[in-house]
């Protein structure tokens, strides 16, 4: 029977030829019970060493308890003692009478664990080990069945998302943990098959209505994977096929994902293996995606130090995650996309590994191919930042870019423009390599423009960006014009100071330097020529400027007078009506404040503000306006009186000289006053 059961993937019903009721499936006089082996549901894979279908001591004590779970018909114990079906099976013993009473479910798992008699569990396990000395798989199945039967609560959702990651094992007492771990150590060779037994029993219970709660099996699974997570990670293909076979049953899929995910909470490497091998392939399925992303979030938060996960995520896994996180209208909801985007920086750290300076060039082609002008703004920002990181960290990325440049002009134009705007943030060590790459791009652009390819627009954009980058790489040009002007002013100032200090050119330092160097005759010739040219220019201005000025004044004066009249009228109008509008605004504000019934402090604040504005208007704005008008009128009258209505060179020269002399005197007075004040303050100190 065991051989047939192992070959068919399930357990057969035990039949008695002398009891017709048993062969027809009717109820026999011996009562119903559930055999332990029925938890082994149909599995796509053949187990290498199937569990022998041996009855357990614990189940014999519950023949009357499990009548509602009618899976097999078995004759009563008295009939079996007379004519057993299999002589190899040991003689059955009756269970303790106190355990034959069915208990109802507890309100919570905490209450169920408090009510659990650990001594009774140990007693049952000792009996099982004494009866089935050579079959440790039966011991383990007795443990799981006992715990699951005693820990009955209202059924929870499959992923236990409202509880900590180690629930329900975190509620187990130290004594019970010792019993579970001790039994797992004794039956170490059957632990992997025991994990399969717990998983498939959970899946079978989900088919029942109402089924049992699964806390006992969950506790056993967590206890197994705390010490042996490789039971899951060494068989990922097998479990992925199991998951896909139940894809139409979300509750079963989530139960499988929860059970396999327990392997990741003791080791980051094993957790990433589970997520990449089990949960990433189903990412995008509406019912499974929330748990997959929540598991990844919890996994990355549990391990702040990601060094143990380096090398687990490669380009093959990284870029599908990038598309899921940033591409719109994919199978993830916006909230899940946002959650995945928040995890993406940590995923980048895991993907780039411990030595990004030697691995980033492998990511560069996929980053560049996705950076199209039509990609979403958030994705474009992430791609450009990642491409810049590749170019600045891994020197081999520039050589990869050179190979891809002619076939990725639109993407390269975006990257070049981004580099142009962020050139100052690029490290100086990477600028030299980038400068050489951009120079090669300039030559490529010229060749493409000569050929006149269909993507001329992108070539022109790339060429413009390359020229701008090269200009920035070479640095800003020196301001030669400003430097020459500054040098000229300094030379003139030094010469004037030298002549004034020595009262003559021959005694000055400049004169003596020119005379000793033999350049004095040349300097005299240059000065003579400059003087003659200056005199000619002066004579020309003396003859031309009065005539031009008079003509210009005759032409422009009517228009200027008309414009002045309009400007004066406009400002007078604004000045006249400004007070009325301010008064209207003040009255309106006062009425509003009275209707609104603001606090007294706000009334006082607004009243003070109104008084301040009126004071500023009457004390500052109006006097300044009148002073400006008076000053302009005085300037006009002074010019008219000084020139007597005619623009002559002597008049212009006199006015400029007077203004310059007055300005110079004012500057001297201010400078002397400042120096006196400074000396006074220094002497007081």
From Swiss-Prot:
<feature type="transmembrane region" description="Helical">
    <location>
        <begin position="479"/>
        <end position="499"/>
    </location>
</feature>
<keyword id="KW-0256">Endoplasmic reticulum</keyword>
<dbReference type="Pfam" id="PF10151">
    <property type="entry name" value="TMEM214"/>
</dbReference>
<dbReference type="GO" id="GO:0005829">
    <property type="term" value="C:cytosol"/>
</dbReference>
<dbReference type="GO" id="GO:0005881">
    <property type="term" value="C:cytoplasmic microtubule"/>
</dbReference>
<feature type="glycosylation site" description="N-linked (GlcNAc...) asparagine">
    <location>
        <position position="267"/>
    </location>
</feature>
<dbReference type="GO" id="GO:0005783">
    <property type="term" value="C:endoplasmic reticulum"/>
</dbReference>
<keyword id="KW-0007">Acetylation</keyword>
<keyword id="KW-0472">Membrane</keyword>
<comment type="function">
    <text>Critical mediator, in cooperation with CASP4, of endoplasmic reticulum-stress induced apoptosis. Required or the activation of CASP4 following endoplasmic reticulum stress.</text>
</comment>
<dbReference type="GO" id="GO:0006915">
    <property type="term" value="P:apoptotic process"/>
</dbReference>
<dbReference type="GO" id="GO:0005794">
    <property type="term" value="C:Golgi apparatus"/>
</dbReference>
<keyword id="KW-0812">Transmembrane</keyword>
<comment type="similarity">
    <text>Belongs to the TMEM214 family.</text>
</comment>
<feature type="transmembrane region" description="Helical">
    <location>
        <begin position="612"/>
        <end position="632"/>
    </location>
</feature>
<dbReference type="GO" id="GO:0005789">
    <property type="term" value="C:endoplasmic reticulum membrane"/>
</dbReference>
<dbReference type="InterPro" id="IPR019308">
    <property type="entry name" value="TMEM214"/>
</dbReference>
<keyword id="KW-1133">Transmembrane helix</keyword>
<keyword id="KW-0325">Glycoprotein</keyword>
<feature type="region of interest" description="Disordered">
    <location>
        <begin position="1"/>
        <end position="36"/>
    </location>
</feature>
<feature type="glycosylation site" description="N-linked (GlcNAc...) asparagine">
    <location>
        <position position="305"/>
    </location>
</feature>
<comment type="subunit">
    <text>Constitutively interacts with CASP4; required for the localization of procaspase 4 to the ER.</text>
</comment>
<feature type="region of interest" description="Disordered">
    <location>
        <begin position="66"/>
        <end position="104"/>
    </location>
</feature>
<keyword id="KW-0053">Apoptosis</keyword>
<protein>
    <recommendedName>
        <fullName>Transmembrane protein 214</fullName>
    </recommendedName>
</protein>
<feature type="modified residue" description="N-acetylalanine">
    <location>
        <position position="2"/>
    </location>
</feature>
């Amino acid at each position: 029977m065991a051989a047939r059961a192992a070959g068919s993937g399930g357990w057969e019903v035990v039949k008695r030829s002398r009891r017709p009721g048993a062969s027809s499936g009717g109820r026999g006089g011996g009562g119903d019970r559930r055999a332990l082996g029925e938890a082994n549901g149909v599995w796509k894979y053949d187990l290498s060493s199937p569990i022998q279908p041996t009855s357990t001591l614990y189940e014999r004590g519950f023949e009357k308890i499990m009548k509602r779970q009618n899976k097999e018909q078995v004759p009563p114990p008295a009939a079996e003692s007379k004519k057993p079906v299999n002589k190899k099976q040991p003689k059955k013993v009756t269970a303790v009478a106190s355990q034959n009473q069915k208990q109802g479910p507890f309100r919570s798992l905490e209450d169920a664990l408090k009510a659990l008699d650990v001594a009774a569990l140990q007693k049952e396990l000792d009996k099982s080990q004494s009866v089935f000395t050579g079959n440790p798989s039966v011991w383990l199945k007795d443990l799981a069945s006992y715990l699951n039967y005693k820990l009955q609560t209202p059924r929870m959702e499959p992923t236990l998302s409202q509880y900590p990651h180690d629930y329900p094992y975190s509620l187990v007492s130290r004594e019970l943990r010792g019993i579970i771990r001790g039994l797992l150590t004794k039956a170490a060779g059957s632990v992997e098959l025991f994990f399969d037994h717990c998983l498939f029993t959970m899946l079978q219970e989900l088919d029942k209505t109402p089924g049992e709660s699964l806390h006992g099996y969950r506790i056993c699974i967590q206890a197994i994977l705390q010490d042996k997570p490789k039971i899951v990670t060494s068989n990922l293909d097998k479990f992925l096929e199991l998951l896909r076979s139940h894809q139409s049953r979300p509750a079963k899929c989530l139960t499988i994902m929860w059970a396999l995910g327990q392997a990741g909470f003791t080791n980051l490497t094993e957790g990433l293996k589970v997520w990449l091998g089990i949960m990433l392939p189903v990412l995008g399925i509406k019912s499974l995606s929330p748990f997959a992303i929540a598991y990844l979030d919890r996994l990355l938060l549990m391990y702040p130090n990601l060094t143990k996960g380096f090398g687990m995520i490669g380009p093959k896994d990284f870029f599908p995650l990038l598309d899921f996180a940033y591409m719109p209208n994919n199978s993830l909801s916006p909230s899940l996309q946002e959650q995945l985007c928040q995890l993406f920086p940590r995923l980048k750290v895991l993907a780039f590994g411990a030595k990004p300076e030697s691995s980033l060039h492998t990511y560069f082609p996929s980053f560049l191919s996705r950076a199209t002008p039509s990609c979403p703004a958030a994705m474009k920002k992430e791609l450009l930042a990642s491409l810049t990181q590749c170019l600045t960290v891994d020197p081999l990325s520039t050589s990869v870019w050179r190979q891809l440049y002619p076939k990725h002009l639109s993407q390269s134009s975006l990257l070049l423009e981004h580099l142009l705007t962020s050139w100052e943030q690029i490290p100086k060590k990477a600028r030299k390599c980038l400068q050489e790459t951009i120079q090669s791009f300039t030559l490529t652009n010229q060749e493409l423009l000569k050929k006149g390819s269909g993507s001329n627009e992108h070539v022109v954009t790339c060429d413009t960006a390359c020229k701008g980058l090269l200009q920035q790489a070479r640095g800003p040009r020196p301001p030669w014009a400003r430097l020459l002007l500054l040098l000229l002013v300094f030379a003139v100032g030094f010469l004037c100071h030298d002549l004034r200090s020595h009262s003559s050119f021959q005694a000055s330092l400049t004169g003596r330097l020119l005379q000793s160097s033999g350049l004095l005759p040349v300097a005299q010739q240059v000065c003579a020529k400059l003087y003659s040219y200056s005199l000619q220019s002066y004579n020309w201005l003396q003859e031309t400027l009065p005539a031009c000025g008079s003509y210009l004044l005759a032409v422009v004066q009517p228009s200027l007078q008309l414009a002045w009249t309009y400007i004066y009228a406009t400002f007078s109008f604004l000045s006249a009506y400004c007070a009325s509008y301010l008064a209207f605004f003040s009255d309106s504000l006062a009425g509003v404040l009275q209707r609104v019934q603001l606090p007294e402090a706000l009334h006082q604040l607004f009243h003070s503000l109104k008084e301040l504005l009126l004071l500023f208007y009457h004390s500052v704005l109006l006097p300044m306006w009148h002073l400006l008008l008076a000053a302009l009128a005085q300037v006009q009258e002074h010019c008219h009186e000084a020139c007597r209505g005619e623009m002559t060179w002597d008049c212009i020269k006199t006015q400029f000289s007077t203004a310059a002399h007055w300005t110079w005197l004012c500057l001297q007075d201010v400078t002397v006053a400042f120096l006196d004040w400074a000396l006074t303050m220094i002497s007081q100190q």
